[in-house]
Structures are given as C-alpha cells and as structure tokens.
C-alpha cells in the first residue's frame, strides 16, 4: 500500500476547543504518524503520513460538516497538500 504525506490547513474556530486533541485521537485510530499544530493566524496545521486510504479518511473527518465524529469547534475550510512521506513516527500535538 502506497504511503503518502497529507498536510491540511484547517480554517475556522479550531483553537482552544480541543481540536488538536481530537485530531490526534483520530489519527492514532487510523494508525497515522504526524502532528497537529496551532498556527499564529488561528489555523491548525495537520500533517499525517501513512497509507493513502487512511490519510483520505482523516481528511474526510476533518472536512465533514456536521461532524459525525463529535469534532470540537467549527471547520470552515480545509486546504490540503499531498506529498512524499518523510517517515515520521507517532502522532503528536504541538
């Protein structure tokens, strides 16, 4: 199965509401590696590496409105970028 790297910039009310914690739990459930980080402009940057189907599922969960996964906050837009994996391990909040 091909591994990929997803970088998703999540816009909306996503800081100070448990969004990074929720993203980490979803990524760990999907067995993805990477991170979820607050950006100074109010966005959250999610980097995930793993099988393409699993990364696509995380992206679907990030974008879904309303969320059937009890996602905290409110997502307005998700900008995605795809690339080659860098072989990171584990998934962390930053």
Swiss-Prot record:
Enzyme class: hydrolase
Pfam families recorded: Acylphosphatase
E.C. numbers: 3.6.1.7
Listed InterPro entries: Acylphosphatase, Acylphosphatase-like_dom, Acylphosphatase-like_dom_sf, Acylphosphatase_CS
Domain Acylphosphatase-like: 5-94
Entry-linked NCBIfam families: PRK14422.1
Protein name: Acylphosphatase
């Amino acid at each position: 199965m091909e591994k990929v790297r997803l970088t998703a910039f999540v816009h909306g009310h996503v800081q100070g509401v448990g969004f990074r914690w929720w993203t980490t739990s979803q990524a760990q459930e999907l067995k993805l590696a990477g991170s979820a980080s607050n950006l100074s402009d109010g966005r959250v940057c999610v980097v995930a590496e793993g099988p393409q189907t699993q990364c696509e599922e995380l992206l679907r969960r990030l974008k879904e409105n309303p969320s059937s996964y009890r996602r905290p906050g409110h997502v307005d837009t998700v900008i995605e970028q795809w690339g080659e994996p860098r072989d990171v391990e584990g998934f962390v909040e930053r």
